[in-house]
Amino acid sequence: MALSLRVQAQKAATHELAITPATAAWGYYDAAAPPVLRIKSGETVRVHTLITSTPARLEGAGLPAAQVEPNLRDIVEHVTNKGPGGHILTGPIFVEGAEPGDVLEVRIQAVELAIPYAYNAFGAKSGFIPEDFGYAKMRIIPLDKKKMVAHFLPGVEVPLRPFFGSMGVAPPAASGRVNSAPPGIHGGNLDNKELVAGSTLYLPVHAAGALFFVGDGHAGQGNGEVDITGLETSLTGTLQFIVRKDMHLTLPRAETPTAYISMGLNEDLTLAAKDAVREMIAFLATEKHLSRDDAYMLCSVAGDLDVTQVVDGTRGAHMILAKSLFGKAKKQKGN
């Protein structure tokens, strides 16, 4: 990171953004959505998100009424401007200086559990193999914040790695209101379980201010998210936003403290996987100055090509490449 960006980050303010009927975007990404918060590049937002469900569904699955969050009741009762998707998102956040063609760097500084439960559910016509499960089922799953596990069943504990399934910016204005379910060039419902605290997401900007939305909190998830939900819950995140004029992307990209991540998105999973590989090759050629031939070979011998999700209409694939591969090259250059 350039020195000017480090100084900017150190001096940046922190904002608090609650989830209320006035700050909720139910089921869409839209360049015409009015901002609920305006911030400067380099500033941080502690943003609250809600479980994507309704009190009736949660109570129907056995959750005591007293454990339903009051904000969820308020939003379900008062938000009428909703759809076409079903996710309850917080936003959008307007980042000053962001313009189409830029990249919005989102540093995920912290992701915290907000409630002591999650749910998992599948429907009669959703998920990856609905032909095998022609009915709907929903389960409330206790979360143990101290042990950071979900008590899935007696004797079955799932480690928690909280992340936001949906983080994105406004799509191009010509796209109008976009369904929150399929991911796209704007990011959105990526459902990438690597985007935990300490990771950074890079999103191509399509509208003034970027207009960032976030939600679909997961306490954990498996790659593929095969029944259409993970450990769905409410989360609080601390996110820092930096406008990058020096980067230009066509698809979202990410990195963790130990790895680089490229992404591919397409209704055809094979084509999504091809794009993930092409994006990593482009990254290696541009940022690591490898030839395309060498980049392709490195992806094959050291890159892990994974399925992100197969249930959101637009399928997702991603490639992970360890940063440690480049340690010796850095030392030779004196970096």
Task: State where each predicted segment sits.
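Intrinsically disordered, low-complexity linker/loop segments enriched in Gly/Pro
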Residues: 87-88, 94, 109-196
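Short, Lys/Arg- and Gly-enriched loop/turn segments at beta-strand edges
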Residues: 52-65, 111-121, 209-219, 308-311
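Extended, compositionally biased flexible segments
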Residues: 52-53, 57-96, 102, 108
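C-terminal segment of classical bacterial N-terminal signal peptides
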Residues: 1-8
